[in-house]
Design a protein with these regions (language model features):
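Function-determining sites in protein domains
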Residues: 1-142
């Protein structure tokens, strides 16, 4: 009985610790988006270029089987990887040309075309941090 109680206690501590490491990301992305980042079977990376004032995909790469994707997924949902103090609460919208990459998390290649979670990435200028934002949601984080 003591061993079972010890196991339940350890599991509870682990869950609380894990939640503490990801709480701000969950608040920023939302639970559904964070789940898509962590578990979507199909992931694409699109290179963006500004065309007629709009960000346009000029190159698409399927990274679903890429080495290190599991680490990237994890990094995208860990609070420590972002500068939460730099995030503008209601700052100005970045211009279309500021966004360098788009990541699509979807159920399939066909779904990536129109569905799925979309994250836009601004890699920033040299010596400056970048930004990440969820397409269709307000706010961004550095």
């Amino acid at each position: 009985m003591a061993l079972l109680l010890l196991g339940l206690t350890a599991a509870s501590v682990a869950i609380a610790f894990q939640r503490g490491q990801t709480q701000r990301c969950l608040d920023f992305y939302g639970t559904e988006a964070a789940t898509a980042i962590s578990r979507a079977p199909h992931v694409e990376l699109w290179q963006l270029t500004e065309v007629d004032g709009l960000p346009t995909a000029t190159r698409r790469v399927d990274i679903s089987e890429a080495k290190g994707l599991v680490h990237l997924r994890r990094g995208l949902v860990e609070d420590a990887n972002f500068d939460w103090e730099a995030a503008p609460a209601a700052g100005p919208t970045l211009p279309a040309g500021a966004w360098d990459w788009l990541m699509v998390f979807a159920d399939s290649s066909a779904a990536a075309e129109s569905d799925g979670l979309r994250l836009v990435l601004d890699l920033g200028d040299e010596g400056q941090g970048g930004w990440i934002s969820v397409v269709g949601q307000g706010g961004r984080v550095g």
